Amino acid sequence: FFDSEIRATDEELTFLYDYFFTIDIWGNYELELFSTISTLFPLPLYFKYSREMLQKTDLLGSLPSNKVGIDTILINGLFKAIEEKDKLKADYFTFQIEKRDLPESEAYLKIIYMIAKGYYDTIFNVKNKGLEKIQRGITILQDLEYVDGARYYENYFANQLSNKDL
């Protein structure tokens, strides 16, 4: 997992934009690369790139390997928007995820999305209801022996929620 304090430089962002958006159709490689480095982008840029990514993947977006990459990018965008308390962008990512309908075969992503929805509720709606969803998601990860994932989200929310006036 990445250090959330690291940000890409303007020069790096320009290079990445030129690379990503001169390619007409994104495949698995571009999605994997974008998914890996996109956490370095500030939210406005992540949002812009994600919208453009959805257009670039229209043709190949339904392939199983590409679908997982796209879903991961959208869920990461949702977390990023919630962290910055940008409800409009969080709602956009939620809409795109709901529209794509996470399949049962991607249970891990469904659990992470449930955690993200709990975070959304904690920040924008009903705090206790959201915290319950987060804890339930982490418990499911623990029960399924996704130890690293459960630990990551426990630490993530210990940091995020202790630094906020909820």
What are these regions (language model features)?
Residues 1-2, 32-36, 72-80, 109-120, ...:
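"A position-specific structural signal for the A-helix of alpha-solenoid helical repeats
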Residues 26-33, 64-73, 103-113, 144-155:
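Alpha-solenoid helical repeat architecture
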Residues 15-21, 54-61, 94-102, 135-146:
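Amphipathic alpha-helical segments of tetratricopeptide repeats
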Residues 76-132, 141:
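Extended alpha-helical scaffolding segments
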Residues 13-61:
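Hydrophobic, aromatic-enriched interface-forming segments
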Residues 5-14, 43-55, 84-95, 130-133:
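Helix-turn-helix repeat elements of alpha-solenoid scaffolds
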Residues 128-166:
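C-terminal non-catalytic interaction modules
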Residues 5-6, 42-48, 79-81, 117-129, ...:
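Alpha-helical linker/edge segments of TPR/alpha-solenoid repeat scaffolds
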